[in-house]
Design a protein with these regions (language model features):
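Short, Lys/Arg-enriched N-terminal segments with co-localized hydrophobic residues
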Residues: 1-3
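Alpha/beta enzyme core
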Residues: 5-56, 60-307
Length: 307
């Protein structure tokens, strides 16, 4: 798999290794075993570290992110991957559909996150309309996301028919996350937001994932698939790490839209979302308190003014 390196073991024996001297002195102690891989010890997360995490049985986390300050917060929290997703269409720009956002709108968001993140890997979505026409279009769009936006990798919604797109990106030196299962950019073709991989469809998702991994994707993201399908895919792609969103806990990593998992948005959230906080309520209460203190003259007080 492209972007993954294989380290030669330091313990390989050599035919020229010195033999112990025939003396009464004690033989030197054998070299200690190599230290187990620890993702938390990695100073800058790269594709190889995610593969090592899967091999070591360690899970990693990904959150969406769209600005520098939030990137800094998530970086301090140890989140390994930040996804500048086309979900920005909904949660940042106020569009009804992710299909609306353009590449030109995505790039400034990617650049902001890249400036804020120091440890996490920044992955940028290829938005609808920026890659479908040809592998060449995909490469041109991805180059902009990396060159102008500072992304470390791109995510592409694809199936087995798009292996040449992935190969073209990888040949250009662009790490690829392949998105299979439910692909939001194809919501109309899929008949809406529906769980994928039920029954015989499970094999199709597996075939898509394997084909894209073999084409060079360093990671496979599965969205809204059954637990059985997620396990099937995770096993089938071997050493390639997997990320799930609504794909059970069998994957190597998990991803959520941060506004959903922190309770920033009102209304129903998808079944696969767990809300770890209610930031929206905190912000609303703070804004209301500010407004009331401005009206009453309590703010600004003496300690907030200059003589």
């Amino acid at each position: 798999i492209v972007s993954m390196t294989t380290e030669r073991s330091s313990e390989i024996s050599s035919p020229y290794a010195a033999q112990p001297a025939a003396t009464s002195a004690a033989a030197p102690a054998p070299a200690s075993a190599s230290k187990p891989f620890d993702l938390d010890a990695v100073k800058k997360v790269r594709t190889v570290h995610l593969a090592q995490a899967k091999a070591a049985g360690q899970k990693f986390s990904m959150l969406t992110c769209y600005d520098a300050l939030t990137a800094q917060i998530f970086d301090r929290a140890g989140i390994e991957m930040l996804l500048v997703g086309d979900s920005a269409a909904n949660v940042v720009l106020g569009y009804e559909s992710t299909l609306t956002i353009t590449l030109d709108e995505m790039i400034p968001l990617v650049a902001a996150v890249s400036r804020g993140a120091s440890r996490a890997m920044v992955v940028a979505d290829l938005p609808f309309g920026s890659y479908e026409q040809s592998p060449q279009q995909a490469v041109a769009s991805a180059v902009r996301l990396m060159k102008e936006g500072g992304a470390h990798a791109v995510k592409i919604e694809a199936d087995a028919s798009m292996t040449e797109w992935v190969r073209a990106l990888v040949r250009t030196g662009i790490p690829v996350v392949a998105h299979v299962g439910f692909t939001p950019q194809s919501e109309h073709a899929l008949g809406g937001f529906r769980v994928q991989g039920r029954g015989d469809a499970s094999e199709r998702v597996r075939e898509d994932a394997v084909a894209l991994a073999e084409a060079g994707a360093f990671c496979v993201l599965m969205e809204m698939v059954t637990t059985q399908t997620a396990q099937l895919v995770d096993d089938a792609v071997g050493a390639v790490p997997t990320i799930g969103i609504g794909a059970s806990n069998v994957t190597t990593g998990q991803v959520l839209v941060w506004q959903d998992m922190m309770g920033l948005r009102e209304g129903r959230v998808p079944r696969f979302v767990k809300q770890f906080a209610q930031i929206g309520k905190v912000m609303e209460d703070a804004a209301r308190a500010y407004r009331e203190q401005v009206r009453s003259g309590e703010f600004p007080a003496a300690e907030h003014t200059f003589e």
